[in-house]
């Protein structure tokens, strides 16, 4: 049987830049850190940290998450392992939650090395929502707030803003897409 190439942009294209350039994400991380905004960090293996960004080293692509703003109890989060960075609003009720560094950074899946810029940009320009299928099984929906070569910004129905890293995505469609 002959193997067909998938030409559907919802499955992404081969990434032009590898390893990923996290400079745009780094700017957002610094903003969240300086403003003591609580975050939910989701790893590629669906581990979750809810807390604050205590420190950030852009040269090493490393976030140090803590249970307090600028706190001393720190968990290392490698950007290469990060699937979702969600900003939690001050109105959200949340329980602080930290997991061990080795559990969070464990790479259960191989990075896709896919670029979903085309589908995300198309949805952004048309003003339609997107539906994101994560490799670990979660499905996210929302409106895109912008996109670059390695991530897409999404505003969810509860108003929270998140950055979704393309390496842990299996497919992205518009929210009005029906199979």
From Swiss-Prot:
Keywords: DNA-binding, Repressor, Transcription, Transcription regulation
Keyword Transcription recorded: yes
Protein name: Repressor of phase 1 flagellin gene
Any Pfam family the entry gives: Flag1_repress
GO molecular function, one term: DNA binding
Organism: Salmonella abony
Keyword Aminoacyl-tRNA synthetase assigned: no
Biological role stated in the UniProt entry: Transcriptional repressor of the FliC phase-1 flagellin.
InterPro entries (alphabetical): Flag1_repressor
Disulfide partners: none
């Amino acid at each position: 049987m002959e193997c067909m190439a998938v030409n559907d942009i919802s499955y992404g294209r081969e990434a032009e830049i590898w390893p990923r350039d996290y400079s745009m994400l780094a700017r957002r991380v610094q903003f969240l850190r300086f403003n003591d905004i609580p975050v939910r960090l989701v790893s590629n293996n669906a581990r979750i940290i809810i807390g604050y960004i205590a420190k950030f080293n852009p040269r090493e692509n490393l976030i140090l998450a803590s249970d307090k703003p600028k706190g001393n109890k720190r968990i290392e989060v490698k950007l290469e392992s990060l699937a979702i960075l969600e900003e939690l609003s001050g109105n959200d009720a949340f329980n602080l939650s930290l997991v061990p560094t080795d559990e969070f950074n464990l790479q259960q899946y191989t990075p896709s090395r896919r670029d979903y810029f085309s589908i995300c940009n198309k949805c952004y320009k048309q003003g339609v929502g997107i539906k994101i299928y994560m490799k670990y099984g979660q499905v996210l929906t929302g409106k895109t707030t912008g996109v670059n070569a390695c991530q897409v910004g999404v505003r969810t129905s509860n108003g929270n803003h998140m950055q979704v890293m393309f390496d842990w995505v299996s497919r992205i469609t518009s929210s009005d897409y029906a199979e």
